[in-house]
């Protein structure tokens, strides 16, 4: 009865029927109605979450090889200490481990909400860091380390919100399942794809919340706080251009040089990419920010089809001989296509523009066009409400992200899937993802836990 006002407790002891009835209703509410559940002890919760994130980042769960045994053990232990029964699934020979945990909801007949995150992180160039990339030190109000932003910080937010929901006695409207995968950074073959292929019955969600999107006062438009919730992502079309020429001595230039043939093909392929047709979600983004976007690489990549020259390979011998003209040369191009763009037509257009029988264009990846999830759902509304509670003047909009995430494997099945990162980040911080000096602001990390908690206890 600690949540019942003192005056009413005294009335109940005196036996007043009305007071006793009020007490009974409130007491029942503590066990039946989420609105009457106690709030978490946030200072204690936040201190523990911060320490947990540091422990998590200190585990170098680098992919390759995606050995996530230690990371999975840490998260499993946290969940078990909170009264959950997580399950581990081994999906590969080198310690690739996935984790599932479930919090039952009020209506077990409804499909669950899936919280999706990943254990693995990309490799580091330790020499380029000014510190140990796995030390997880706190400096200048931020946690520094590989995986802090992508995506161990968000994973701890999801898990902490889930744990506090259970501790507060709040029963969500439907089951909530959390899935942590082992190899998001290698296209998910042993992670999300393996789980979907082998244990979809454990998932089968109504909605998915994953990484992607964020809030920023400068990323989308200068001086305006905008939160983007990812409702779709671009298709990944990786191409290899191979040129054939005539080998020769470097002292005697020839026209049929594979390197110059390749350079000309790259120029033709990339100088005039196919025109972009209007995409509804991009038009909605433009309206949300008032028609004017910031000019930066992230936004520019979101609004259009893009092509990046990523590798060049040529030469003869090891070490490569400078005085030998090679007979072959290769390049790879990372093409990212907007939803609805036909990848076959895009590739054919590139071949037609190159128009050189000495050059072949080979596809290295099969793009997945999963479409765009609706922003007119109860879950999207819950995310908007939770964000505006913390940031009343913010603009909340659906958006595309230029990169790929695990959620595409579920969106392709028609499941509404969202990239939801409830933190305000500047462009410099966002740029550290997969780069050097990766970090996450402590204040925003902790605020994100509260926002996630509000979303999970909503009606969706």
Language model segments and positions:
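Short, low-complexity intrinsically disordered segments enriched in A/P/G/S/L with frequent Arg
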Residues: 9, 13, 19-21
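Metal-dependent amide/peptide-bond hydrolase catalytic core
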Residues: 37-38, 214-453, 459-460
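Acidic/His- and Gly-rich active-site-bordering loop/insert found
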Residues: 39-146, 165-174, 333
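Stable alpha-helical elements in mature extracytoplasmic
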Residues: 45-53, 68-71, 75, 154, ...
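Acidic/histidine-rich catalytic neighborhood of metal-dependent amide-processing enzymes
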Residues: 143, 149-228
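Solvent-exposed loop/turn segments at secondary-structure junctions
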Residues: 62-64, 92-94, 106-108, 119-123, ...
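Sec-exported extracytoplasmic/periplasmic mature domains
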Residues: 54-61, 76, 80-85, 163-167, ...
